[in-house]
């Protein structure tokens, strides 16, 4: 995108802590990142929230009406509430008035809005959400997809996830020649159900990925793999479990640190280390999951996201937009689409 500043549309009404925490994260992004944020939502509430921050910076507000509630069926709600914040935000990307969308609201609605308004990239059967996990190697995260968009997957879907994940890992996470694994119950190519066996065969033949074999559950955080593919049912459970393990580990550390005067001294010495541990294990550091396979950049954040997570989600959106992830995926599949249309 050259010297052009990325424009990030924020669904400011979506999320458990909207709009205040969303606004706080957006204001920080406007101040610290080489990007412009567009706050989409109720102008009165957004202006009041902006004024409540002493470090507020000028941001653009895009009016919307209402939001998609968590108990609403996504498709019908999106069609009924055409001026809802997530619809308006997606339309900004569709009309080239923004380069990406960030939403901590109804994840199903965000995915549906992206599909309805932005559309799938030609050649992609199903979009997938990519979740970034820490590994035992500092600075070497692993991308897992899908983590929630598709409960059931065909082998062809998983094969496409591997290609999209490779592009994400290389251009956003900065991984050189990402190594891809298939989440399975054993290392051998014959292990798993029929979908796993067929997917293994497809991945071996995929010229766009460096497939190194099956990844067992114990391998996910080992640093051996850069991209791991699985269906969204398994991936979402893995994501939530990893989040819980991180929280439990931090709580155990707090409980087991020595108490009393000696404990305070020891804790003071260890404080920088504890801060780094928390940073590596905190899912808020990654901001959210990138919806891969749609014709635009869409970051789906955790519903409980607070300002730091929103800031990181905006940072991720900017990196994905600047590095043209969606366009690179489209270019990768253009040859396949052209061949299919020519009957090859």
From Swiss-Prot:
List the keywords (alphabetical).
Cytoplasm, Lipid biosynthesis, Lipid metabolism, Phospholipid biosynthesis, Phospholipid metabolism, Transferase
Naming one, the record's GO cellular component terms include: cytoplasm
What EC number(s) does the entry state?
A: 2.3.1.274
Write down the SUPFAM superfamilies for this protein, in alphabetical order.
Answer: Isocitrate/Isopropylmalate dehydrogenase-like (SSF53659)
Q: InterPro entries recorded for this chain?
A: FA_synthesis, Phospholipid_synth_PlsX-like
Where in the cell does this protein reside?
Answer: Cytoplasm
Q: Which family does it belong to?
A: Belongs to the PlsX family.
Q: Which PANTHER family match?
A: FATTY ACID/PHOSPHOLIPID SYNTHESIS PROTEIN PLSX, PHOSPHATE ACYLTRANSFERASE
Instruction: Describe, as the record does, how this protein assembles with itself and its partners.
Output: Homodimer. Probably interacts with PlsY.
| Name this polypeptide is given | Phosphate acyltransferase
